[in-house]
Amino acid sequence: MKTIVGNVMPEETRMAILEDGRLRDFAVERNDDMHIVNHIYKGTIQNILPSLQAAFVNIGRRRNAFIYMGDMFPRAASKEEIQQMHLSVGQSVLVQVIKDEQGMKGPKVTANISLAGRYAVLMPTVDYIGVSKKIRDEEERNRLRRIVSEIKPDGMGLIIRTVAKGVSREELLKDLQYLLGTWDSILQRYKRSRKPTLLYREADLVMRMIRDHFTADVKQVVVDSREAYERICQVFPDPAWRSRVRLYEGTVPIFEQYAIEESLTHLMSRIVPLPSGGNLVIDHTEALTVIDVNSSKYTGNGSTLQDTIFHVNKEAAVEIARQLRLRDIGGIIIIDFIDMVQPTKRDEILQS
């Protein structure tokens, strides 16, 4: 079972997900205006860069946002259609942030808007129906698709999230109506605004974590902020859900109480131990991340050499996925597993 743990401080908020007492996911957000991913703005085209097929957009912040032409028009548009569409300096645009400011670079934005709800993601500019790949039951996928096709407005897209598995038509419709109301409010503010401005602010880390991860397999949500606790309870009036939300009032800091602080310290280490005695060595360069798998002290306890290697590699595959998620590592990743002779064993490692 999972536990969601929240540590809310004046400077920053930290959220963690534990699975059987072990750190599975972690996120941190500073309590300032620097994190703006998924915020929606009214912007003005400031400068067009034909050679890059891109433009700079004034969204009312200290640095202009950057947008590729391919992100300026609906995803359904073809290359030919995009080339025929005309942009001009001073033109107003409705954009959503997809990447925060970094160093001297402004945020990256798109005109393909998406609004996340509890059960669904609304895409107002694209006609599309999708169901999360994590819902694998074909009968359930078909049921959800039928419901979406009945309730989705023409010309808009709706993606059903994993947490929607098993929910009723009424619950999905209620979530959609909330998202449509939010979208209508954004459009009204866009029409009224005379200059670049913020139109919609994405939920903070606490509420995003609850929205995205508070599912039936979560045993408890524990936060050390009364304000955050009360906000979560307001979202879940059902006593069955609310009973799983708890305010932590202990004297020991909450991340120490749940041994999360110790786990976070290990995330700073280059060497990651494996349960068997093997280890991972994680190295970063400017271009890529390299992960080396070592058997180290593990001898296999009487197993054959190939069985020993397979066991270490299988442990490593699971732990590597966990480390990539916790360390937020992306881009090019090279993994050097211990050599295996049998192709079937190699395939099994890839599947794990």
Residue ranges of each PLM-predicted region?
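DE-rich acidic low-complexity regions and acidic surface loops
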Residues: 1-352
